[in-house]
Design a protein with these regions (language model features):
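The first (N-terminal) embedded transmembrane alpha-helix
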Residues: 1-8, 194, 331, 403
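Extracellular loop-to-transmembrane helix junctions
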Residues: 9-105, 226, 232, 422-435
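Transmembrane helix-loop boundary segments of multi-pass membrane transporters
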Residues: 12-23, 96-107, 129-140, 274, ...
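Helix-loop-helix junctions that connect adjacent transmembrane segments
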Residues: 22-23, 99-109, 138-276
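Membrane-helix boundary/coupling elements in multi-pass transport proteins
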Residues: 49, 72-90, 196, 200-209, ...
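TM-loop-TM module centered on a large, flexible mid-protein loop between adjacent transmembrane helices
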Residues: 55-57, 62, 94-101, 219-291, ...
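Membrane-interface loop-to-helix entry segments
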Residues: 110-164, 220-225, 361-368, 380, ...
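Terminal cytosolic tails of multi-pass membrane transporters
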Residues: 370-395, 414-506
């Protein structure tokens, strides 16, 4: 998930449960992600390989666990496609309001833009436009830079006593509001984890270096630490800008674009509109990335389960799994229409619901990986003569504890709202379904595991940075400049473009 996208909408989801303490939930989420990152860093450095969550889980504790992790990731990607598409709709509608097309956003507009986002993602996933991901990367960088400028202005004006609403400097956002239990923070932390989704993809940029055992941990920890600091500082500035009192928290929760609103209030309408537009474009890019990731993972799962039948059509020109892509994007569009017609008129509801479901199943994958990391580092590696470090015995267990308690707190006590219960049921059914398949069809499970392991590149996330770097590689090769490609080799039977696959390993 792009940083500008996450910082502009995920905090509202946490704010609905923890009020002013949103930055505190991101502190906890950052700690949790760093604990998980430790396992990734240690395993990848031992194996000198930047594998996916499901690939490394399969290596450390067995192919069955790897299949569960792969299935969980597919559920997360499908959910996040809904999340990011709806986010594009919400920010796109807010941008049009800023242009003066209407004073109050018509309820249908975000849904229409979300469907357009799915359509654009479908077209680009099937027939990628050269340089499109590099362009999206630059939009993300520029939007993040504008957000940083707004943050500085907000802090200066609040500290100087010149805030537009009389807001004063305070650190109340790092204290749990009266009447709210500390354990409630673990309800809001879900949106913190959502902001980090896919952080382990940074390892793909370290794998091709001359010293991967050093580069991979730096890449993983660097992304997790930078992301954590960005989100903690960003949400703190947001609370300062809106105010940590009841009125400020209410305005915070109702804002369609957090830094867009702050830019408009503290600097000018044009600045706010730029942030909102940039975030909408970032959301569309993330929708494309999740569509690419989900379709390739579905392709690999389907090939293993049905022995080459089903979603197997691949473009001879681009190597894109066309049938899987059309199914994933068509399913996303159908769900958006169904939810709008039969469930809710509020666009933010689908954003929050899909984000929660996706994060819960993603935590299952991260939890399985953390179990595998502890087992590999503390049991298997010592048997092979590799002594475990003292932290190896502790950090993965802490990661398991944080993930486990987060999931427990989202279930117990049982939610009062129908949507809260539905989120848990959907996530549970998704995970239980693959467990049933594993128990009932062990031969199918083995085929799926083999398909996933042979196609890690095909079942990976299309991260902005990895794909953008690959495009730079291709440009250099066209001009006969020697370069070491950061791209993932194409899986057997798939076509390559410019000598390299379009997927970046997660």
């Amino acid at each position: 998930m792009g940083a500008s996208l996450a910082i502009n909408i995920n905090p509202q989801g946490a704010g609905a449960t923890v009020g002013r303490a949103v930055p505190l939930t991101f502190v906890l989420a950052t700690i949790g992600v760093l604990l998980v990152a430790y396992g990734f860093a240690r395993i990848c450095s031992r194996l000198s390989h930047a594998g996916s969550v499901f690939g490394l889980t399969g290596i450390t504790i067995g192919p069955r666990a790897g299949v569960v992790a792969g299935w969980a990731l597919l559920g997360a990607y499908l959910s996040f496609m809904l999340t990011t598409s709806m986010t594009a709709g919400i920010f796109g509608a807010e941008f049009l309001r800023g242009l003066g097309l209407y004073e109050t956003t018509p309820g249908i507009v975000p849904w229409i833009i979300a469907l357009l986002s799915v359509g654009i993602a479908t077209l680009l996933a099937i027939s990628p436009v050269k340089k499109s991901m590099a362009t999206l990367l630059w939009v993300e960088i520029c939007t993040t830079a504008v957000i940083a400028i707004i943050a500085v202005v907000v802090v200066v004006r609040v500290v100087g006593g010149n805030a537009p609403g009389g807001q004063r400097f305070t650190l109340d956002m790092f204290m749990v509001p009266p009447g709210t239990s500390t354990s409630t923070l673990f309800l809001g932390i879900v949106f913190g984890f959502l902001s980090f989704a896919g952080f382990e993809a940074a390892a793909s940029l370290g794998e091709e270096t001359t010293n991967p055992k050093r580069a991979i941990p730096i890449a993983i920890f660097g992304v997790a630490l930078f992301g954590g600091l960005f989100y903690i500082v960003g949400t703190s500035v947001q609370m300062l800008g809106f105010g940590s009192d009841a009125a400020g928290v209410d305005a915070f929760s109702k804002s369609a674009s957090l830094f867009g609103t702050l830019g408009e209030q503290y600097i000018g309408a044009v600045v706010g509109d730029l942030v909102t537009l940039g975030t909408a474009v970032s959301a569309m890019g993330c929708a494309l990335a999740t569509a690419v990731a989900a379709s390739r993972l579905l392709f690999a799962l389907n090939r293993g389960a049905f022995d080459g039948r089903g979603f197997t059509k691949v473009s001879p020109k681009t190597g894109t799994p066309i049938s899987a892509t059309l199914f994933v994007c068509g399913l996303a569009a159908a769900i958006i229409v169904l939810v709008r017609v039969a469930v809710t008129n509020t666009a933010f509801d689908l954003f929050a619901w899909s984000g929660t479901v996706g994060t819960l199943v993603l935590l299952v994958a991260y939890g399985l990986f953390s179990v595998g990391a502890w087992y590999y580092l503390c049991v298997r590696a010592p048997r092979q003569g590799h002594k475990a470090a003292a932290l190896d015995y502790v950090i993965p267990l802490l990661a398991i504890a944080v993930i486990g308690y987060t999931m427990f707190r989202n279930v117990i006590p049982w939610p009062d709202t129908a949507s809260g219960r539905a989120n848990i049921v959907i996530a549970t059914v998704w995970v239980v379904a693959i467990v049933v398949v594993i128990v009932a069809a062990p031969k199918t499970t083995r085929r799926i595991a083999q398909s996933l392991n042979s196609d890690e590149g095909l079942a990976s996330e299309a991260g902005y940075l990895a794909v953008a770097v690959e495009e730079v590689d291709e440009s250099l090769r066209e001009h006969n400049v020697p370069t070491t490609s950061l791209a993932t080799p194409a899986a057997p039977g798939t076509a390559q473009r410019g000598g390299s696959a379009r997927a970046a390993k997660s």
